[in-house]
Protein backbone atom coordinates (compact mmCIF):
# COMPACT_ATOMS: atom_id res chain seq x y z
CA UNK A 1 0.00 0.00 0.00
CA UNK A 2 1.52 3.32 -1.00
CA UNK A 3 0.60 6.98 -0.63
CA UNK A 4 -0.51 8.67 -3.85
CA UNK A 5 0.94 11.84 -5.37
CA UNK A 6 -0.57 15.02 -6.76
CA UNK A 7 -0.29 13.58 -10.29
CA UNK A 8 -2.38 10.53 -9.32
CA UNK A 9 -4.95 12.69 -7.49
CA UNK A 10 -5.38 14.94 -10.55
CA UNK A 11 -5.75 11.92 -12.85
CA UNK A 12 -8.33 10.22 -10.61
CA UNK A 13 -10.31 13.45 -10.27
CA UNK A 14 -10.36 13.91 -14.05
CA UNK A 15 -10.98 10.29 -15.10
CA UNK A 16 -13.16 8.99 -12.25
CA UNK A 17 -14.68 12.15 -10.73
CA UNK A 18 -13.14 11.10 -7.41
CA UNK A 19 -13.41 14.65 -5.99
CA UNK A 20 -16.05 17.17 -7.05
CA UNK A 21 -15.66 20.10 -7.20
CA UNK A 22 -11.93 19.61 -7.71
CA UNK A 23 -9.11 22.14 -7.39
CA UNK A 24 -6.00 20.90 -9.28
CA UNK A 25 -3.62 23.30 -7.50
CA UNK A 26 -3.14 24.49 -3.93
CA UNK A 27 -5.15 27.71 -3.50
CA UNK A 28 -3.89 30.28 -0.97
CA UNK A 29 -5.79 33.36 -2.16
CA UNK A 30 -9.31 33.97 -3.42
CA UNK A 31 -10.14 37.33 -5.01
CA UNK A 32 -6.89 38.76 -3.65
CA UNK A 33 -7.69 37.73 -0.05
CA UNK A 34 -5.61 35.21 1.93
CA UNK A 35 -7.42 31.98 2.77
CA UNK A 36 -6.51 28.83 4.63
CA UNK A 37 -5.17 26.74 1.75
CA UNK A 38 -7.21 24.11 -0.07
CA UNK A 39 -6.85 21.94 -3.16
CA UNK A 40 -4.19 19.54 -4.40
CA UNK A 41 -0.93 19.35 -2.45
CA UNK A 42 2.13 17.16 -3.01
CA UNK A 43 0.69 13.98 -1.47
CA UNK A 44 -2.85 14.85 -0.54
CA UNK A 45 -5.90 16.98 -1.05
CA UNK A 46 -6.82 19.82 1.32
CA UNK A 47 -10.60 19.79 1.78
CA UNK A 48 -12.85 22.77 2.45
CA UNK A 49 -15.61 23.19 4.97
CA UNK A 50 -19.06 24.12 3.58
CA UNK A 51 -21.14 26.91 5.12
CA UNK A 52 -23.53 24.68 7.09
CA UNK A 53 -22.70 23.78 10.69
CA UNK A 54 -24.27 22.05 13.67
CA UNK A 55 -22.93 23.52 16.92
CA UNK A 56 -23.12 21.40 20.06
CA UNK A 57 -25.20 22.90 22.85
CA UNK A 58 -26.59 21.80 26.18
CA UNK A 59 -29.63 24.08 26.23
CA UNK A 60 -31.97 21.08 26.16
CA UNK A 61 -30.08 19.15 28.88
CA UNK A 62 -29.92 15.98 26.84
CA UNK A 63 -27.34 13.21 27.03
CA UNK A 64 -24.99 12.33 24.19
CA UNK A 65 -25.62 8.71 23.21
CA UNK A 66 -24.18 7.45 19.89
CA UNK A 67 -26.78 4.65 19.77
CA UNK A 68 -29.72 6.98 20.38
CA UNK A 69 -28.59 10.43 19.30
CA UNK A 70 -30.87 13.38 20.02
CA UNK A 71 -30.73 16.13 17.38
CA UNK A 72 -31.59 18.65 20.12
CA UNK A 73 -27.90 18.54 21.07
CA UNK A 74 -27.15 20.84 18.12
CA UNK A 75 -28.06 24.29 16.87
CA UNK A 76 -27.93 24.85 13.10
CA UNK A 77 -25.70 27.68 11.84
CA UNK A 78 -25.21 28.80 8.23
CA UNK A 79 -22.68 31.42 7.23
CA UNK A 80 -19.17 32.44 6.19
CA UNK A 81 -17.84 31.19 9.53
CA UNK A 82 -18.93 29.37 12.66
CA UNK A 83 -18.08 30.24 16.26
CA UNK A 84 -17.57 27.16 18.43
CA UNK A 85 -18.07 27.77 22.17
CA UNK A 86 -15.18 27.05 24.56
CA UNK A 87 -14.56 23.34 25.21
CA UNK A 88 -17.28 22.38 22.75
CA UNK A 89 -17.52 21.12 19.19
CA UNK A 90 -19.34 21.50 15.91
CA UNK A 91 -20.13 19.31 12.94
CA UNK A 92 -19.89 20.45 9.33
CA UNK A 93 -19.49 18.91 5.90
CA UNK A 94 -17.06 19.29 3.05
CA UNK A 95 -17.63 21.37 -0.06
CA UNK A 96 -16.26 18.39 -1.99
CA UNK A 97 -18.13 15.18 -2.80
CA UNK A 98 -15.90 12.07 -2.83
CA UNK A 99 -16.09 8.79 -4.75
CA UNK A 100 -13.44 6.43 -3.41
CA UNK A 101 -12.17 3.64 -5.70
CA UNK A 102 -12.42 0.02 -4.53
CA UNK A 103 -8.64 -0.33 -4.03
CA UNK A 104 -8.16 2.97 -2.14
CA UNK A 105 -8.39 3.95 1.53
CA UNK A 106 -7.95 7.51 2.79
CA UNK A 107 -6.77 8.98 6.06
CA UNK A 108 -7.71 12.55 6.91
CA UNK A 109 -5.69 14.83 9.20
CA UNK A 110 -6.48 18.32 10.47
CA UNK A 111 -4.54 21.31 9.17
CA UNK A 112 -1.82 22.71 11.42
CA UNK A 113 -3.30 26.22 11.10
CA UNK A 114 -6.28 25.07 13.17
CA UNK A 115 -4.31 22.69 15.42
CA UNK A 116 -2.03 25.56 16.49
CA UNK A 117 -5.15 27.39 17.67
CA UNK A 118 -6.37 24.46 19.78
CA UNK A 119 -8.93 23.31 17.21
CA UNK A 120 -8.86 19.59 16.45
CA UNK A 121 -10.42 18.33 13.20
CA UNK A 122 -11.53 14.70 13.28
CA UNK A 123 -12.58 12.66 10.26
CA UNK A 124 -12.71 8.89 9.98
CA UNK A 125 -11.10 7.12 6.98
CA UNK A 126 -12.98 7.08 3.67
CA UNK A 127 -13.35 3.38 2.97
CA UNK A 128 -13.15 1.61 -0.41
CA UNK A 129 -16.17 2.48 -2.59
CA UNK A 130 -17.58 4.95 -0.07
CA UNK A 131 -19.03 8.10 -1.57
CA UNK A 132 -20.61 11.26 -0.22
CA UNK A 133 -19.89 14.57 1.43
CA UNK A 134 -17.55 14.16 4.38
CA UNK A 135 -18.88 14.98 7.84
CA UNK A 136 -16.27 16.97 9.76
CA UNK A 137 -15.97 17.31 13.53
CA UNK A 138 -14.26 20.36 15.01
CA UNK A 139 -13.32 20.23 18.70
CA UNK A 140 -12.49 23.51 20.39
CA UNK A 141 -10.08 22.48 23.14
CA UNK A 142 -9.55 26.05 24.35
CA UNK A 143 -11.32 28.09 27.06
CA UNK A 144 -12.13 30.71 24.38
CA UNK A 145 -14.58 30.79 21.46
CA UNK A 146 -13.04 29.51 18.20
CA UNK A 147 -13.79 30.48 14.59
CA UNK A 148 -14.01 28.02 11.67
CA UNK A 149 -14.07 29.49 8.16
CA UNK A 150 -16.42 28.17 5.49
CA UNK A 151 -15.08 27.56 1.98
CA UNK A 152 -11.47 27.39 3.21
CA UNK A 153 -9.13 24.49 3.97
CA UNK A 154 -9.67 22.52 7.18
CA UNK A 155 -7.99 19.12 6.72
CA UNK A 156 -5.85 17.07 4.35
CA UNK A 157 -6.91 13.76 2.81
CA UNK A 158 -4.13 11.24 2.11
CA UNK A 159 -4.86 8.52 -0.45
CA UNK A 160 -3.45 5.00 -0.10
CA UNK A 161 -3.75 2.49 -2.95
CA UNK A 162 -3.70 -1.20 -2.00
CA UNK A 163 -1.71 -3.87 -3.82
CA UNK A 164 -4.88 -5.94 -4.02
CA UNK A 165 -8.60 -5.18 -4.12
CA UNK A 166 -10.61 -5.80 -0.94
CA UNK A 167 -13.14 -8.64 -0.89
CA UNK A 168 -15.90 -6.52 0.64
CA UNK A 169 -16.13 -2.76 0.13
CA UNK A 170 -18.14 -0.16 2.04
CA UNK A 171 -20.71 -0.20 -0.78
CA UNK A 172 -20.90 -4.04 -0.72
CA UNK A 173 -21.76 -4.13 2.97
CA UNK A 174 -24.32 -1.30 2.68
CA UNK A 175 -22.45 1.13 4.92
CA UNK A 176 -24.82 3.42 6.83
CA UNK A 177 -23.11 6.65 5.73
CA UNK A 178 -23.08 5.79 2.01
CA UNK A 179 -24.07 8.73 -0.19
CA UNK A 180 -24.54 11.11 2.73
CA UNK A 181 -25.45 14.71 1.97
CA UNK A 182 -25.51 17.65 4.35
CA UNK A 183 -24.13 17.42 7.87
CA UNK A 184 -24.87 13.84 8.91
CA UNK A 185 -25.50 12.99 12.56
CA UNK A 186 -24.65 9.60 14.14
CA UNK A 187 -26.71 6.68 12.84
CA UNK A 188 -27.21 3.46 14.75
Curated annotation (Swiss-Prot):
It is an enzyme of class 3 (hydrolase). InterPro entries: dCTP_deaminase, dUTPase-like_sf, dUTPase_trimeric. GO terms for biological process: dUMP biosynthetic process; dUTP biosynthetic process; nucleobase-containing small molecule interconversion. Its EC number is 3.5.4.13. This is dCTP deaminase. CDD domains: trimeric_dUTPase. It comes from Laribacter hongkongensis (strain HLHK9). NCBIfam families: dCTP_deam. The active site is at 137 (proton donor/acceptor). One of its GO terms (molecular function) is nucleotide binding. The keyword Cell membrane does not apply. Homotrimer. Catalyzes the deamination of dCTP to dUTP. SUPFAM superfamilies: dUTPase-like. PANTHER family: DCTP DEAMINASE.
Amino acid sequence: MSIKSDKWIRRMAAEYDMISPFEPDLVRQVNGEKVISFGTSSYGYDIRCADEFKVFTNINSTMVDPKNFDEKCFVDVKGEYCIIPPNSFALARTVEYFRIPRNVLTVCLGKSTYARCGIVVNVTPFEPEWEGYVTLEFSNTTPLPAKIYANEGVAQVLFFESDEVCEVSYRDRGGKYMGQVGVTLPRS
